[in-house]
C-alpha cells in the first residue's frame, strides 16, 4: 500500500504557501508510451480543513467531471489513466481541449504524477496554483542531455479564460514553426497548445523561448527520456510548471543530489545585463533569454543575480536524471508538503541546517532535530530505462 507523507516545515519569520491553493490549472505533456507513460494520476491532500475537489476539463465535454471529498488531514489519488488519450497534450502545433481546472472548497495541495508500472520513466509535476498563472514567461530548459530517439522536449500552454491571445517566440525550431519567428494563437478557456522541439539534440532545446498573453495562462515544461549517458546510462522524464516572470526571484540555494557526476544548474535571464554571482563571486553577465550553465560538484551553491531569473536544476541518483524549476529563497515553496513514495527505489531528503522539521507519516511522527533544517522545494523521482 502506498503511504502518504506529510512534511511540516516550521520556518522562523517566514510564511509561504506556494503550492497550497483552491484553484489550479494544468496541462499534461505527451510522454512516450514506448518508454512508459502510464498510469497517470492526480494526488491531493488537505490540511486542517475538509475539502470538496472538482476536477474538470472546461473545453472537453468528453471528460467526465470528477468530484472527490477529503476530510481534514486526508489524501486521495485520482487515477486518470482511462482518459490518457484526452489528457496528454498531443499532437504538437494543434489547439486541443485538454486543459484541467481543479477547484477546491478549502486550500489543498495537488500534483500530477507519471508513475509507469515499469518504474522506468516517472516524474512529479507539482501544481503551483496562483503562482503558476501569468501573462509573461521565459522558458528554462537543460542543454546537456539529448532525448531518446522516440521522445521530445517542449512546453505546453493552457488558457484560463476565453479569447486568450498567446504569442510564442521559439528560441529553436518547433513543430510547425521556425526559430526566432513569433506567432500567435487564440485559445478559449481550457484549451491547450503544445510547442515541441523538432530535434532530440540538447542544444536544440527551447531554453529562452518567450510566451506572452493578454490573459493569465499556465505553462508546463517537459523533457522526456533525457539520456543519462554522461552518468552511465538510463533515460528519464523531467517536467514542471513554469513560474511566470512576475514572481521570479534573484537568490537561490541549491543542494547537490546523488548522480554519478556533477549536477547542472541553468540560469535564464529575463532582463538584459543580468549579473550572476556564484558563492559571492561575480561569474557572468547575460541578456534576456540567454542561459548560463553552472556545473555543481560541491555539496551546495548560492546563486545571486542582479535581476530576477529562472533557475532549473537537474540532479538525481546514479544515472537516473530528474529536475525541477527552483523557487528563490524569498519564496521557498510550502511550509507543508505531501507526496507518495510510489516506488521502493533510492530515496533521500536533502536537508539544510538551521530549522526544526516535523516529519509526519500517517499515525507516526519523527522529529528531525533543529540542527537539521528545511527540505528542498521539490522531491523528485527518477526511474530506469
State each model region's role.
Residues 10-12, 16, 349, 360, ...:
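Generic detector of N-terminal low-structure segments
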Residues 19-351, 355, 361:
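Extracellular lectin-like interaction modules
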Residues 1-22:
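Bacterial Sec-dependent N-terminal signal peptides
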Residues 352-354, 358, 363-382:
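Alpha-helix boundary/capping motif
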Amino acid at each position: 500500500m502506498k503511504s502518504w507523507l506529510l512534511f511540516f516545515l516550521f520556518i522562523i519569520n517566514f510564511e509561504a504557501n506556494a503550492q497550497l491553493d483552491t484553484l489550479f490549472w494544468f496541462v499534461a505533456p505527451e510522454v512516450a508510451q514506448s518508454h512508459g507513460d502510464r498510469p497517470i494520476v492526480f494526488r491531493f491532500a488537505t490540511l486542517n480543513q475538509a475539502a470538496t475537489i472538482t476536477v474538470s476539463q472546461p473545453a472537453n465535454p468528453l471528460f467526465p467531471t470528477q468530484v472527490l471529498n477529503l476530510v481534514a488531514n486526508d489524501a486521495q489519488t485520482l487515477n486518470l489513466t482511462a482518459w490518457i488519450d484526452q489528457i496528454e497534450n498531443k499532437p504538437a502545433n494543434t489547439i486541443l481541449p485538454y486543459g484541467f481546472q481543479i477547484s477546491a472548497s478549502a486550500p489543498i495541495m495537488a500534483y500530477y504524477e507519471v508513475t509507469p508500472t515499469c518504474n522506468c520513466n516517472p516524474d512529479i509535476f507539482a501544481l503551483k496554483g496562483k503562482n503558476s498563472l501569468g501573462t509573461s514567461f521565459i522558458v528554462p530548459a537543460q542543454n546537456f542531455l539529448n532525448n531518446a530517439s522516440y521522445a521530445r522536449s517542449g512546453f505546453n500552454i493552457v488558457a484560463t479564460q476565453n479569447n486568450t491571445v498567446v504569442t510564442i517566440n521559439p528560441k529553436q525550431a518547433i513543430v510547425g514553426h521556425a526559430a526566432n519567428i513569433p506567432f500567435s494563437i487564440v485559445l478559449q478557456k481550457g484549451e491547450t497548445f503544445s510547442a515541441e522541439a523538432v530535434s532530440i539534440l540538447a542544444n536544440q532545446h527551447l531554453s529562452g523561448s518567450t510566451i506572452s498573453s493578454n490573459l493569465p495562462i499556465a505553462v508546463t515544461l517537459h523533457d522526456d527520456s533525457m539520456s543519462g549517458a554522461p552518468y552511465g546510462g538510463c533515460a528519464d522524464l523531467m517536467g514542471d510548471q513554469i513560474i511566470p516572470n512576475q514572481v521570479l526571484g534573484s537568490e537561490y540555494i541549491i543542494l547537490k543530489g546523488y548522480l554519478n557526476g556533477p549536477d547542472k544548474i541553468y540560469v535564464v535571464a529575463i532582463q538584459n545585463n543580468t549579473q550572476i554571482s556564484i558563492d559571492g563571486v561575480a561569474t557572468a553577465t547575460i541578456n534576456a533569454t540567454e542561459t548560463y550553465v553552472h556545473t555543481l560538484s560541491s555539496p551546495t551553491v548560492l546563486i545571486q543575480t542582479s535581476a530576477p531569473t529562472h533557475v532549473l536544476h537537474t540532479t538525481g541518483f546514479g544515472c537516473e536524471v530528474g529536475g525541477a524549476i527552483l523557487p528563490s529563497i524569498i519564496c521557498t515553496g510550502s511550509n507543508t508538503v505531501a507526496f507518495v513514495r510510489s516506488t521502493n527505489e533510492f530515496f533521500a531528503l536533502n536537508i539544510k541546517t538551521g530549522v526544526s522539521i516535523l516529519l509526519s507519516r500517517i499515525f507516526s511522527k519523527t522529529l528531525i532535530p533543529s540542527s537539521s533544517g528545511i527540505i528542498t522545494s521539490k522531491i523528485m523521482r527518477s526511474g530506469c530505462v
